[in-house]
Swiss-Prot record:
Residues 8-282 form the tr-type G domain. Belongs to the TRAFAC class translation factor GTPase superfamily. Classic translation factor GTPase family. EF-G/EF-2 subfamily. Keywords: Cytoplasm, Elongation factor, GTP-binding, Nucleotide-binding, Protein biosynthesis. Pfam families: EF-G_D2 (PF22042), EFG_C (PF00679), EFG_III (PF14492), EFG_IV (PF03764), GTP_EFTU (PF00009). CDD domains: EF-G, EFG_III, EFG_mtEFG1_IV, EFG_mtEFG_C, EFG_mtEFG_II. This is Elongation factor G. GO terms for biological process: ribosome disassembly. Catalyzes the GTP-dependent ribosomal translocation step during translation elongation. During this step, the ribosome changes from the pre-translocational (PRE) to the post-translocational (POST) state as the newly formed A-site-bound peptidyl-tRNA and P-site-bound deacylated tRNA move to the P and E sites, respectively. Catalyzes the coordinated movement of the two tRNA molecules, the mRNA and conformational changes in the ribosome. GO terms for cellular component: cytoplasm. InterPro entries: EF-G-like_DII, EFG_II, EFG_III, EFG_III/V, EFG_IV, EFG_V, EFG_V-like, G_TR_CS.
């Protein structure tokens, strides 16, 4: 079957923003105008097409990146709607990995908000070109100029309007296109009728000035345009469009548009901009992976149907009707349903049962996928998030995604024996879907412990266990994921010798422990000379250290950010074994704990609090009382924003406290930033609690 859309006419885009900026509504309107849905679902009514999980419709937020395909003019647009809540940044990270371009949605009253900064940084890391849509122009306090200024001030972005709004709040009625110098008026409460009108006289000078600024900003990234501009030559619409496109693709410029998705104003022009300025799979650099057997050998996956098949699985979901669904992005080649693929990450052969094109949670079966496509496969049993799928003769591994470790834990106990079996299944499936969700059984207490990125994250997962898997469970209080580390170097010996008739056990190691850089993790160095510890026992020493570090040395928390150098030791020809050296290494760690000044570390969260100015004193006092450190303050319109680092242990239940301190007018976001040493008095309490005193 031939492809329906050429690669040039394909766009893979994401819609990204801060929570409540109107991403999902914007996506809904795109689907409406591209003919994918006939009735528009409003997020605040809990009926949105893209928010298809029950938890999403209850809460009015987007949790999982729903992928959907739409058609605009004769182009195919694959859209991924990403969550704006900070607990779900991993979903954003996953979708950015497989996109070619993105639309950043801003709230016209707030401009760039904390989560916008986070996703913007992620998009920059992955080299994703962006256009900006200033949404909610009909909202009280909407201010287009202010929103654009926040792009410069908070993101240092070379962003320039390619449109101007006429009016704001309930007076917002028309948009001037600065590229074509045409003006579009929206009539009716919901912009049902679009009419092209003359630019009003009182806007002519402003529009001419704004077009001049636009040309200047684009010319900075385009020598030919700069030359024409300096010589005072007329720049044609096509030349300006081409220059904007090139500068956007090179990530040197960000076009800014405006509108109100809820009132259907500006969405069609934004779709035109997606086609005009965001890349096709041919415009982005071919993805580079490495050979499965040789990490140093680069392998390129070109955007070409005739090349070897290569794709990246970026999401796994459980569908109530078809079972496990694996979403993937095809980078090169084609794939037919029913054929076999190789999962080169795990070196497994998989059969693709069916191929589906997704529209939020409805699906259309297709027989073939081509390079540049985003689709879902049924039947891939072994494939997880971040795995590479390729042709059976191909040996490429595409760069996978790195996911943060959980910072918050809860215990969950099934209410009955029947719930226990269902819970085990549910936890396996939820971990397959979400790499930042961890579950394990505590060896001492036998409790099941789940870990995630924040209270909301775990809340929703427990909710899903109940609703999707019918698991009734008792949930414990949240627990912080503390860590331990050494503050000073230590040279120690660990010796294990046992003789009890027959073959004995003997292992002897001398290890130098030194603190590692924050966030660098554990590093092991083999500095043995002359075979005093035979080569075959070296991995056992490292494994023994890693095992012992899992249970810490102070209060039972994992030991991190430590270097261990094995520099001496001894062995016995008959009695030495892998197990003996493993035990010797763990004894060395215990010895080091006596002299290396071990301390407990706690997760520090970066917290950003927005509130009316009159509550500033109360909020600052509250942050300090939670052992927080204020990192900065700035005015945001007529509100104040406080940035601070606060220990996670002090942030439980903060939403309630903020509500009462600001009479419901304050909002906050927080995300994990780094680990920091716990004050001595608090460390003592943690140790006592862990010992059950």
């Amino acid at each position: 079957m031939a492809r329906d859309f050429s690669l040039e006419k394909t766009r893979n885009i994401g819609i990204m923003a801060h929570i409540d900026a109107g991403k999902t509504t914007t996506t809904e309107r795109i689907l409406y105008y591209t003919g994918r849905i006939h009735k528009i679902g409003e997020t605040h009514e809990g009926a949105s097409q893209m928010d298809w999980m029950e938890q999403e419709q209850d809460r009015g937020i987007t949790i999982t990146s729903a992928a959907t395909t739409a058609q605009w003019h004769d182009y195919r647009v694959n859209i991924i709607d990403t969550p704006g809540h900070v607990d779900f940044t991993v979903e954003v990270e996953r979708s950015l990995r497989v996109l070619d371009g993105a639309v950043t949605v801003l709230d016209a009253q707030s401009g760039v908000e904390p989560q916008t900064e986070t996703v913007w940084r992620q998009a920059t890391t992955y080299g994703v070109p962006r256009i900006v849509f200033v949404n909610k122009m009909d909202k009280l306090g909407a201010n287009f100029e202010y929103s654009v200024s926040t792009l410069h001030d908070r993101l240092q972005a070379n962003a320039q309007p390619i449109q101007l709004p006429i009016g704001a709040e309930d007076e917002f009625e028309a948009i001037i296109d600065l590229v074509t110098m045409k003006c579009y008026q929206y009539n009716g409460d919901f912009g049902e009728e679009v009419v092209e009108i003359e630019i009003p006289d009182d806007y002519k000078d402003k529009a001419a000035e704004a077009r001049e600024s636009l040309i200047e900003a684009v010319a900075e990234a385009n020598e030919d345009l700069m030359e024409k501009y300096l010589e005072g030559e007329e720049i044609t619409i096509d030349e300006l469009k081409a220059a904007i496109r090139q500068a956007t693709l090179d990530i040197e410029f960000y076009p800014v548009l405006c509108g109100t998705a809820f009132k259907n104003k500006g969405v069609q022009l934004m779709l035109d901009a997606v086609i005009d300025y965001l890349p096709s799979p041919l415009d982005v650099k071919p993805i580079v992976g490495h050979h499965a057997d040789n990490p140093d050998e680069e392998v390129i996956a070109p955007a070409d149907d005739d090349a070897d098949f290569a794709a990246l699985a970026f999401k796994v979901m459980t569908d109530p009707y078809v079972g496990k669904l694996t979403f993937f992005r095809v980078y090169s080649g084609t794939l037919n349903s029913g054929s076999y693929v190789k999962n080169s990450t795990k070196d497994k052969r998989e059969r693709v049962g069916r191929l589906l094109q997704m529209h939020a949670n409805t699906r259309k079966e297709i027989s073939t996928v081509y390079s540049g496509d985003i689709a879902a496969a049924v039947g891939l049993k072994e494939t997880g998030t971040g795995d590479t799928l390729c042709g059976e003769k191909n040996d490429i591994i595409l760069e996978s995604m790195e996911f943060p470790e959980p910072v918050i834990h809860l215990s969950v106990e099934p209410k009955s024996k029947a719930d226990q079996d269902k819970m085990t299944q549910a936890l396996v499936k939820l971990q397959e879907e979400d790499p930042t969700f961890h579950a394990h059984t505590d060896e001492e207490t036998g409790q099941v412990i789940i870990g995630g990125m924040g209270e909301l994250h775990l809340d929703i997962l427990v909710d899903r266990m109940k609703k999707e898997f019918n698991v009734e469970a008792n949930v414990g209080a949240p627990m912080v994921s503390y860590r331990e580390t050494f503050k000073t170097p230590a040279k120690v010996q660990g010796k294990f010798s046992r003789q009890s008739g027959g073959r004995g056990q003997y292992g002897d190691v001398h290890i130098e422990f030194t603190p590692n850089e924050v966030g660098a993790g554990f590093e092991f160095e083999n500095a043995i000379v002359g075979g005093v510890v035979p080569r075959e026992y070296i991995p056992s020493v490292e494994a023994g250290l890693k095992d012992a570090m899992e249970n810490g040395v102070v209060a039972g928390y994992p030991l991190i950010d430590v270097k261990a150098k094995l520099y001496d030791g001894s062995y016995h020809d008959v009695d030495s074994s892998e197990m003996a050296f493993k035990i010797a290494a763990s004894l060395a760690l215990k010895e080091a704990a006596k002299v290396a000044d071990p301390v407990i570390l706690e997760p520090m969260m970066k917290v950003e609090i927005l509130m009316p100015e009159e509550y500033m004193g109360d909020i600052m006092g509250d942050v300090t009382s939670r052992r927080g450190r204020v990192d900065g303050m700035e005015a945001r319109g007529n509100a104040q924003m406080v940035r601070a680092f606060v220990p996670l242990s002090e942030m439980f239940g903060y939403a309630t406290s903020l509500r009462s301190n600001t009479q419901g007018r304050g909002t906050y976001t927080m995300y994990f930033d780094h680990y920091e040493e716990v004050p001595k008095s608090i460390a003592e309490d943690i140790i006592k609690k862990n010992k059950g005193e």
